[in-house]
Amino acid sequence: MSARIIDGKAAAARVLGQVRDDVHTLKAEGIEPALAVILVGNDPASEVYIRNKIVRAEEAGIRSLEHRLPADCSEARLLALIAELNTDRSVNGILLQLPLPAHINEAHALQAIAAAKDVDGFHSENVGGLSQGRNVLTPCTPSGCMHLLKETCGDLTGKHAVVIGRSNIVGKPMAALLLQAHCSVTVVHSRSTDAKALCQLADIVVAAVGRPRMIDAGWLKPGAVVIDVGINRIDDQGRSRLVGDVDFDNALDVVSAITPVPGGVGPMTIAFLMKNTVTAARQQAHAQRSQSEAVCLSIY
């Protein structure tokens, strides 16, 4: 079997093209989408991620605002900045780059971001709304994975999907989105005793466990579609390179389609961050119009 390599870069380019069109429409209505990015400290990997996000925002026509805080800044200072951005009507999305320094409570900081501006989809209001099937801002990586799956498979109804990993960022929201698409969903994790056997039954496998090449061909059903979320840096004969959670070369002869690492899920995450920013801008503009109309009606 010759597997199809799912091109995340090409798919992301299509999503960003639609985002650009949406931004153009919003600007014609007097709405300029804006994304505020907060970086605490100077972690090299975070610097790269931030730079990539800002470049994509500029390409899409989204105004980006960069806020940098020193690594030793207090949690109170970070929360004060978030509160200021929450009330700034010119800012539609707030992105807090993770990880944060150890002395700052990550959960507190993420929860402080207004749900309407939470373009990462991590606020409890958005998490709860996702589980209820409401129209909320959803986490970017799972949303990107779903887009790739729908482009690759079409209708997902009735397919058996296994999600490997139960993180709040990928595993749990991924399972919720697959359920919304009418899949039968199994989540396996570090305490699962039959993870391999469950994966062998899956039409769709989403790997998000953070262990390099953990899943080989023996885990996979012939013809399965594999979305590899893992990004792991390994030493390969003295050279550093990125690999996924799936042994890519080993799986190629078994699966029908698979995402590469890099070039698979990563570009989709940033594309859906931009998409969420535009969605947030549109929703906020609608809410402000509705509020203004309500005020006018109350006057008359």
Swiss-Prot record:
Pfam families hit by this protein: THF_DHG_CYH, THF_DHG_CYH_C
Source organism, top-level taxon: Bacteria
Binding annotation for NADP(+): 165-167, 190, 231
GO-annotated molecular function: methenyltetrahydrofolate cyclohydrolase activity; methylenetetrahydrofolate dehydrogenase (NADP+) activity
Enzyme Commission number(s): 1.5.1.5, 3.5.4.9
CDD domains reported for this sequence: NAD_bind_m-THF_DH_Cyclohyd
Gene3D superfamilies: Leucine Dehydrogenase, chain A, domain 1 (3.40.50.10860), NAD(P)-binding Rossmann-like Domain (3.40.50.720)
GO cellular component labels: cytosol
PROSITE patterns, alphabetized: THF_DHG_CYH_2 (PS00767)
InterPro entries: Aminoacid_DH-like_N_sf (IPR046346), NAD(P)-bd_dom_sf (IPR036291), THF_DH/CycHdrlase (IPR000672), THF_DH/CycHdrlase_cat_dom (IPR020630), THF_DH/CycHdrlase_CS (IPR020867), THF_DH/CycHdrlase_NAD-bd_dom (IPR020631)
Pathway where this protein functions: One-carbon metabolism; tetrahydrofolate interconversion
Keywords: Amino-acid biosynthesis, Histidine biosynthesis, Hydrolase, Methionine biosynthesis, Multifunctional enzyme, NADP, One-carbon metabolism, Oxidoreductase, Purine biosynthesis
HAMAP family in UniProt: THF_DHG_CYH
Subunit and interaction comment: Homodimer.
PANTHER family: C-1-TETRAHYDROFOLATE SYNTHASE, CYTOPLASMIC, C-1-TETRAHYDROFOLATE SYNTHASE, CYTOPLASMIC-RELATED
UniProt protein name: Bifunctional protein FolD 2
Gene designation: folD2
